[in-house]
C-alpha cells in the first residue's frame, strides 16, 4: 500500500510513477474520495463544537431553573447529524482504503521505463552455453525416456499442468530443495521456516495478492482460505501487526513449500513439461530490512540465488525488469533466467524483488529505531532461491548426454547417495 500522505500531498508524483507502469488507474478517484472524507471530518468537528456549546447552554438553563426543552431538542438533532456524518465518513474511508489496495507499488528511480518484457534490461551473463555434438532434447522427452517424469498418470490423477515424479526424479527434486535450503541456512544466514500452505484472506492481502489477483489463486470456498502461490506470502506475514527491533534487522527466512497457481491467462503457454504447473516446489527467501539498506539487501539476495546456479554449473543471465513488467508489490525486480538448450533460450528461474514499505504498510510491519522514537515501516524483500522444478528442468537439459543419460552435478551427488549418472 502506498503512503497515504504521499497521495494526499503529491498526487501528481504518484500519477506519473504509475504511468510508468502503463497503469490505467485514475488518481482523481482518490482525490475525490479524500476531499469528501476531509470535508466530512471538518463538518463533524464543527458540529461537535456546536454540541459542546449546546450542552453548556442546557446545563446553564437547568441551573437557572429555565425550560431547556428547545435546547435539548437542538442538541439531539446535532448528535444525530454527527452520528450520520461519522458513518458516512467511515464508508468513504473504507472505499478509499479499498481503492488503495488495488494500486501497485511505485517503481524505484533505477528501474528502466518500459511496457513489457521486451523492454527489460540485461545486466549480466554467467557461463557459456554448452556446445552439443547432438541435437539437445527438451526436458519432458528426457524425463519420460528415463522413467522419472509421468505426465500421463498425473493427468489421470489431477488433469493438465501436473506431474508425477518417479524414482530418480523424485529424489533429484528433493536433492535440489535440500541443497538450496542447506546453502541458505549454512552459508547465507537464513532461518528455516515451515509455514502453513494455506492462509486466510488477510494474509493474502498483506503481500498484495488480494484483492486484485484472486483469479490467480486456488481458494477453499467453504473456509475462505487460499493455497499459497509462493512462500513469500506466509513468510512475510509472520510479522504482520508486529514491531521489530532495529538491532534485529536484517532478518532472513527461507522455506521450501509447494506453490499453487491457477495460471489464469496462460492458456496455450508452456502446455508441455514442468515450466508452468498448477503445483510446483520452490525454495523462497524473504528478508526484512532497514529502509536505508534495503537495496543493499536486494543485491545480496540476488547474489544468493546466483551462487546456487553457479555451483550447479548452469549458465544464466540477470535482467532488470522494466516498469511495465514488474509485479504488483515490487519497487524493483531482478529476474534470473537459466539457459535451456532444449528450448534454445533463457527461462526465468528466480525473481528477486525489493517491495520497499509497500507490503509492510498493508501488513502493518514496523520496527522500533534503536535510539527511540516513533516506529517505522520496515522494507520487505523476497526472492526465489530457487524454483525447484525449473532447476530440475535446467539440470536435465544442460547435463543430458547423447546416449540419453544425464550427469548429476557434483554438488548434488551427496544428496543423491553418490549417484553420478541418471540412466534408464
Curated annotation (Swiss-Prot):
Compartments where located: Cytoplasm
MF terms (GO), sorted A to Z: ATP binding; serine-tRNA ligase activity
Residues binding ATP, per UniProt: 261-263, 348-351
Chief subcellular location: cytoplasm
GO BP annotation list: selenocysteine biosynthetic process; seryl-tRNA aminoacylation
Residues binding L-serine: 230-232, 284, 384
Pathway given in the UniProt record: Aminoacyl-tRNA biosynthesis; selenocysteinyl-tRNA(Sec) biosynthesis; L-seryl-tRNA(Sec) from L-serine and tRNA(Sec): step 1/1
InterPro entries documented for this protein: aa-tRNA-synt_IIb, aa-tRNA-synth_II, aa-tRNA-synth_II/BPL/LPL, Ser-tRNA-ligase_type_1, Ser-tRNA-synth_1_N, SerRS_1_N_sf, SerRS_core, tRNA-bd_arm
UniProt-listed Enzyme Commission number(s): 6.1.1.11
UniProt entry tagged with the keyword Nucleus: no
One CC-aspect GO term: cytoplasm
Reactions accelerated catalytically: tRNA(Ser) + L-serine + ATP = L-seryl-tRNA(Ser) + AMP + diphosphate + H(+); tRNA(Sec) + L-serine + ATP = L-seryl-tRNA(Sec) + AMP + diphosphate + H(+)
The keyword Aminoacyl-tRNA synthetase is assigned to this record: yes
Keyword annotations of the record: Aminoacyl-tRNA synthetase, ATP-binding, Cytoplasm, Ligase, Nucleotide-binding, Protein biosynthesis
HAMAP family attached to this UniProt entry: Ser_tRNA_synth_type1
Family of this protein: Belongs to the class-II aminoacyl-tRNA synthetase family. Type-1 seryl-tRNA synthetase subfamily.
Domain-related comment: Consists of two distinct domains, a catalytic core and a N-terminal extension that is involved in tRNA binding.
Name used for this protein in its record: Serine--tRNA ligase
Organism: Nitratidesulfovibrio vulgaris (strain DP4) (Desulfovibrio vulgaris)
Gene: serS
Amino acid at each position: 500500500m502506498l503512503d497515504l500522505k504521499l497521495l494526499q500531498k503529491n498526487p501528481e508524483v504518484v500519477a506519473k510513477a504509475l504511468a510508468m507502469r502503463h497503469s490505467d488507474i485514475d488518481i482523481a478517484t482518490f482525490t475525490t474520495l479524500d476531499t469528501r472524507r476531509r470535508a466530512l471530518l471538518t463538518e463533524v468537528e464543527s458540529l461537535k463544537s456546536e454540541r459542546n456549546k449546546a450542552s453548556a447552554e442546557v446545563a446553564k438553563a437547568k441551573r437557572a431553573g429555565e425550560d431547556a426543552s428547545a435546547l435539548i431538542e437542538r442538541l439531539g438533532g446535532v448528535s444525530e447529524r454527527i452520528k450520520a456524518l461519522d458513518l458516512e465518513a467511515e464508508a468513504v474511508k473504507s472505499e478509499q482504503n479499498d481503492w488503495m489496495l488495488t494500486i501497485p507499488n511505485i517503481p524505484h528511480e533505477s528501474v528502466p521505463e518500459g511496457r513489457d518484457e521486451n523492454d527489460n534490461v540485461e545486466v549480466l551473463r554467467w557461463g557459456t552455453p554448452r556446445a552439443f555434438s547432438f541435437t539437445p532434447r527438451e526436458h519432458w522427452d528426457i524425463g519420460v525416456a528415463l522413467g522419472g517424469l509421468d505426465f500421463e498418470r498425473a493427468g489421470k490423477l489431477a488433469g493438465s499442468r501436473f506431474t508425477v515424479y518417479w524414482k530418480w526424479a523424485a529424489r533429484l527434486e528433493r536433492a535440489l530443495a535440500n541443497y538450496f535450503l542447506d546453502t541458505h541456512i549454512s552459508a547465507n544466514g537464513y532461518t528455516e521456516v515451515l509455514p502453513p500452505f494455506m492462509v486466510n484472506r488477510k494474509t493474502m492481502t498483506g503481500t498484495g495478492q488480494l484483492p486484485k489477483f484472486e483469479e490467480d489463486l486456488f481458494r477453499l470456498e467453504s473456509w475462505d482460505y487460499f493455497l499459497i502461490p509462493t512462500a513469500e506470502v506466509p513468510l512475510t506475514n509472520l510479522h504482520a501487526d508486529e514491531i521489530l527491533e532495529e538491532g534485529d534487522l536484517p532478518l532472513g527466512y527461507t522455506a521450501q513449500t509447494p506453490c499453487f497457481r491457477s495460471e489464469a491467462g496462460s492458456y496455450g503457454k508452456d502446455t508441455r513439461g514442468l515450466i508452468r504447473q498448477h503445483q510446483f516446489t520452490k525454495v523462497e527467501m524473504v528478508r526484512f530490512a532497514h529502509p536505508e539498506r534495503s537495496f543493499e539487501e536486494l543485491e545480496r539476495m540476488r547474489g544468493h540465488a546466483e551462487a546456487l546456479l553457479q555451483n550447479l554449473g548452469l549458465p544464466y543471465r540477470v535482467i532488470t525488469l522494466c516498469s511495465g513488467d514488474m509485479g504488483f508489490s515490487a519497487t524493483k525486480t531482478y529476474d534470473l533466467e537459466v539457459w535451456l538448450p532444449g528450448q534454445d533460450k533463457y527461462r526465468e528461474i528466480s525473481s528477486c524483488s525489493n517491495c520497499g514499505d509497500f507490503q509492510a504498510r498493508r501488513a502493518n510491519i514496523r520496527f522500533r529505531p534503536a535510539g527511540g522514537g516513533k516506529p517505522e515501516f520496515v522494507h520487505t524483500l523476497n526472492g526465489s532461491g530457487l524454483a525447484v522444478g525449473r532447476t530440475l528442468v535446467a539440470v536435465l537439459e544442460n547435463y543430458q548426454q547423447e546416449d540419453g543419460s544425464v550427469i548429476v552435478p557434483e554438488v548434488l551427488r551427496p544428496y543423491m547417495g553418490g549417484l553420478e549418472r541418471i540412466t534408464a
